[in-house]
């Protein structure tokens, strides 16, 4: 009986860690990656960025009220 409780607790901890990684950790890493590379990427890397946004979209929605990276102002050369 005690072994079942320990096993269930370990499984619960594993699920919580995976959910935390999916909803909080990986989207934060993707946000930081997008912020640093957005203006200098190639077309293939941009497709990879869109894939990451699609993959971690639920976590992006969780973090979006707290992280707001605005675009840089464009320098217009005359």
From Swiss-Prot:
The chain crosses the membrane at residues 10-30, 47-67. It is found in: Cellular thylakoid membrane. It catalyses: a plastoquinone + NADH + (n+1) H(+)(in) = a plastoquinol + NAD(+) + n H(+)(out); a plastoquinone + NADPH + (n+1) H(+)(in) = a plastoquinol + NADP(+) + n H(+)(out). Its EC number is 7.1.1.-. GO terms for molecular function: oxidoreductase activity, acting on NAD(P)H, quinone or similar compound as acceptor; quinone binding. It is a multi-pass membrane protein. One of its GO terms (cellular component) is plasma membrane-derived thylakoid membrane. Keywords: Membrane, NAD, NADP, Plastoquinone, Quinone, Thylakoid, Translocase, Transmembrane, Transmembrane helix, Transport. Coiled coil: none annotated. It comes from the Bacteria. InterPro entries: NADH-quinone_OxRdatse_su_L. HAMAP family: NDH1_NDH1L. NDH-1 shuttles electrons from an unknown electron donor, via FMN and iron-sulfur (Fe-S) centers, to quinones in the respiratory and/or the photosynthetic chain. The immediate electron acceptor for the enzyme in this species is believed to be plastoquinone. Couples the redox reaction to proton translocation, and thus conserves the redox energy in a proton gradient. Cyanobacterial NDH-1 also plays a role in inorganic carbon-concentration. Belongs to the complex I NdhL subunit family. This is NAD(P)H-quinone oxidoreductase subunit L.
């Amino acid at each position: 009986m005690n072994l079942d409780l320990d096993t269930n607790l370990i499984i619960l901890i594993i699920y919580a860690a995976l959910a935390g990684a999916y909803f909080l950790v990986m989207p934060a890493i993707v946000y930081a990656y997008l912020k640093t590379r957005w203006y200098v990427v190639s077309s293939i890397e941009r497709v990879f960025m869109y894939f990451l946004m699609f993959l971690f979209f639920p976590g992006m929605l969780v973090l979006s009220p707290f992280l707001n990276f605005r675009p840089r102002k464009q320098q217009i050369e005359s």
